[in-house]
């Protein structure tokens, strides 16, 4: 089905505005309905650290938080036993932040709660809606990768 260029342009603008809003809304709803004991920023940093250790400056850039803000956040995670500072094995002058086993367990608990909340709501969808949502996830994964990110 071909649509005219003005309508397509309008749809593209609406999608470009809607996607980040919807992603943010899902996150807000999750944190409002669950009691994880973590902030969104803490979960974001733990998720980043679950892939590899980071320098503070890298974390700040990745998460869109100031360097002093990330330092405070990492200090809180470290106090709770969820992150630790280590010497970078490639450059002994550099300190990196790494997730601990307790941090991984905490992150998995949060992710499990998030999945359970979404699963409960997705269960109420009909088969066609589930199939449409599954197709949308594949497209979102492709979009994330084209933007230089990792979908998973």
What positions do the PLM features span?
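A structural signal for well-ordered alpha-helices, especially hydrophobic packing surfaces
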Residues: 23, 27, 53, 141-144
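Charged, amphipathic alpha-helical coiled-coil/dimerization segments
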Residues: 75-135
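N-terminal helix-turn-helix DNA-binding core of bacterial DNA-binding proteins
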Residues: 29-69, 80, 96, 152
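DNA-binding alpha-helical recognition surfaces that contact promoter or target DNA
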Residues: 72
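Short, locally clustered residues in the helix-turn-helix/winged-helix DNA-binding domain
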Residues: 47-51, 111, 138
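Exposed, interaction-prone assembly regions rather than primary DNA-binding/catalytic cores
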Residues: 131-152
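N-terminal leader segment of winged-helix/HTH proteins
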Residues: 1-40
């Amino acid at each position: 089905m071909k649509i005219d260029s003005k309508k397509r342009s309008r749809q593209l603008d609406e999608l470009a505005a809607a996607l980040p809003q919807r992603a943010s809304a899902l996150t807000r709803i999750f944190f409002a309905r669950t009691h994880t004991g973590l902030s969104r920023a803490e979960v974001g940093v733990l998720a980043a650290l679950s892939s590899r250790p980071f320098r503070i400056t890298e974390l700040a850039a990745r998460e869109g938080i100031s360097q002093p803000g990330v330092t405070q956040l990492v200090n809180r995670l470290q106090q709770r036993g969820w992150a630790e500072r280590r010497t970078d094995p490639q450059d002994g002058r550099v300190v990196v932040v790494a997730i601990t086993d307790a941090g991984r367990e905490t992150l998995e608990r949060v992710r499990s709660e998030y999945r359970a909340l979404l699963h409960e709501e997705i269960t109420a969808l009909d088969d066609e809606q589930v199939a449409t949502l599954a197709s949308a996830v594949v497209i979102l994964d492709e979009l994330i990768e084209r933007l230089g990110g990792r979908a998973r």
